[in-house]
Amino acid sequence: MIIVGAGVGGLTAAALLVKAGCRVLVLDRNPHPGGTAYVYKRKGFTFPMGPLGFGTPSVVIKNLQSLDGEDLKLSPIQYRIKAFDLDIPISHPFPKMIEELIKLFPTEDETIKNFFRNMEEIVSAMNDPDMDPNHSILGKAMSESAMEYLSGLVKDWRLRRVLGSIGTQEPYSSLPLLSAMWNLISNQGIWYPVGGMRSLCDRMVQAVSGHRANRDKFGEIKLGTEVEEVRIERGRVLGVILRNGAKIDSAAVISNADYKNTFLKLIDSKFVSDEWYRAVMRARQTSSNLQLCLGVDANGVDLSSFKEADRIIYRRNQADLSGQIDWSAEEIHPEALVCQELEVSLLSKNDRKLGPEGTEIIVIRTEAEHFHFSRFRPTWRKRIPEYQAYKMRLGRALIQEVENLIPGLGRAILVMDIATPLTFEEQGGRSGGAVAGWSWNYEDGSDYRPRELVRTPIQGFYMAGYQAFSALFMGGIPTAMESGRRAARAVLQGDGPVENIMIPVTE
């Protein structure tokens, strides 16, 4: 059994197949396991590659317990929105959220109550969507976008943005997806694993390769080993070809790469229909991020903004909300970048072991478009000289802006690392640097529940990872784990290929 990619989905599938008695080989071009859930080090500091926590903890705990029988200790993550001259806690169950928002928007009290009542109704309906009453509720919810719904409900533009994006943006998603996200962040909560994201990945690695004494249960992970091509003949998978030309046979292959990397790079287009190929090529994904990781001297910064928060969704109070960044320009003005929504995380508050004693780790993220940065890359993993200076200008602007939240930040920096969409693409294996899978925009999808995308048109070839479902209703890590579980089950059951195109594609 071959699994391409040692991300969370691939490791979950591998561990379950090993547990079932299969011999499994996991191949990954990176020098580390875990995909973007892993971490990297800079001068004694440990920085994140991707997720800073996860929702739907029951799925993560259940899957890990099925792998090794051990429990998982978690600590809650508290979110706040600081924008529009408002300070809003959002990591509270719906009743408390109603109470907090009515304090800030007293004239919108009935609107706020109706909104969360509707969110609760949609969440409940999604738990059993095939029941007749629930089917009707969800069908109605999909008939208009979150923007259309809230524009007719909310008078205050600030409240519309908070309710519609759980942040500072205008509403953009469907109502079912919005309700799922509110349910995650408020009712279920976002959680950080005690021991950090690396310990989570290492535990999954142990579940794959920790059975070497038992010859019947053998899993092997080969890092730094890149798959060049998936071998296919007459509609059936045969194995893979490595970048060094070596061929490895296997009657089943699971790809933990995303859909575009898999079907546009690893598989010759002649092995799938034109319709399938076009669907994958045209399917829209989320945008990427510009990420700034900082190791700072704790004595040099004022962290009082984080007294009741671990993560802050921030936007400058007087930011111009009328215009958008022109990402088609050769360079964007740093001032335009800092007027966007920023996510500022005090990561060391959740994990004191990430940096040396007396230090803190701060992560700043904001949305960025991959195509804007592509001109800085002449070839894969190469950059033109202007790239470093440009991303440093953007990073310095973000630091200056975040000093409104964290006074003294600029002078207290000990280590700084900046990742662009090119980094997320090359180091994270995410096509286009996309950080959250398929597009979340209402016009790009019509699901009120995630469609499983594990099976493919090729016999014996399956998908795992955050794109193996049509939407991240559970959040990234739980979705990846669940996809790995279902991919392993599909292999063991010998599930056949699919004919219908289930990928979310805008016509």
Task: Annotate each PLM feature.
Residues W182-R243:
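Helical element adjacent to the flavin cofactor pocket in flavoenzyme catalytic cores
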Residues E228-P356:
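Mid-domain catalytic core of redox enzymes
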Residues E226, I232, L492-E507:
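Active-site-proximal substrate-binding core of FAD-dependent oxidoreductases
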Residues E341-S439:
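FAD-dependent oxidoreductase catalytic-site/capping-region signature
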Residues F84-L177:
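Rossmann-like flavin
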Residues P51, A468-V491:
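A conserved FAD-binding loop/helix module that cradles the flavin
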Residues D156-E170, C339, E343, N404-S470:
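A glycine-rich dinucleotide-binding beta-alpha-beta segment and adjacent secondary-structure elements
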Residues M1-N118, S439:
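N-terminal glycine-rich phosphate/pyrophosphate-binding loop and immediately adjacent elements
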